[in-house]
């Protein structure tokens, strides 16, 4: 099997089979990641460029490490120190990178649709590392990988996503991906942070966290994205935590073996208290490790589309 597109722009347009193929490949990549040498020659001679217009620690670093673990040449463009600061357009920047022989461009941008625009104008494969409030497909893939690793499958699982759904590209990608793999997804958060289009996605929408948590197999907290919000969407972080914080008492409504996830960075004491973050039910650190494996898989699959090679 090969991925149909040269790019990974979102999970909305992927089939369930393609998603599962990526996740299966990530299993093999995790073996490499956990090996003593953490090195494989699969991407030798390939060049991976990270182009981030927004701040990032986990996503950018994991892509860079994923590239190096597979023996690719990896380079990061600091937007503030590049010609972008002089007014260069995204398309011109992309074409410049393209002409230097890049095989993959990993882009994060504040504008929804920026990766799609770039992909239409370059020969290199483009991976969406987060575009505005639209999608964050690699985060959702690593979330699903983590769940399947612990639960065996997503089919039939109840997944509760709690928090700022409106501004969350992570929530959107997870909704697309998890529902395609058979999960029952519920969301909860302040009514001011609920997007109107949720009715079309087949998820259950609640305005109280308690309803969403009942018998949940997986609970995912989302970061309050203050940088994307206008004032007045909720009174204060303290009030948010009071009504939607995932403390031990509320989490008792979920199943006893429910997984606790968060895409990070976590606002400790707001979305989750430290006692939950650092508990045995929390798999937040495992998500970080799995993120490298998933991104290794994507880099491999996108750069080997025309070769017919298999990693297995």
Curated annotation (Swiss-Prot):
GO terms for cellular component: cytosol. One of its GO terms (molecular function) is aspartate carbamoyltransferase activity. One of its GO terms (biological process) is amino acid metabolic process. L-aspartate binds at residues 86, 169, 223. The keyword Plastid does not apply. Pathway: Pyrimidine metabolism; UMP biosynthesis via de novo pathway; (S)-dihydroorotate from bicarbonate: step 2/3. It catalyses: carbamoyl phosphate + L-aspartate = N-carbamoyl-L-aspartate + phosphate + H(+). Keywords: Pyrimidine biosynthesis, Transferase. Its EC number is 2.1.3.2. Carbamoyl phosphate binds at residues 58-59, 108, 136, 139, 264-265. Heterododecamer (2C3:3R2) of six catalytic PyrB chains organized as two trimers (C3), and six regulatory PyrI chains organized as three dimers (R2). Belongs to the aspartate/ornithine carbamoyltransferase superfamily. ATCase family. Catalyzes the condensation of carbamoyl phosphate and aspartate to form carbamoyl aspartate and inorganic phosphate, the committed step in the de novo pyrimidine nucleotide biosynthesis pathway. This is Aspartate carbamoyltransferase catalytic subunit. It comes from Acetivibrio thermocellus (strain ATCC 27405 / DSM 1237 / JCM 9322 / NBRC 103400 / NCIMB 10682 / NRRL B-4536 / VPI 7372). The gene is pyrB.
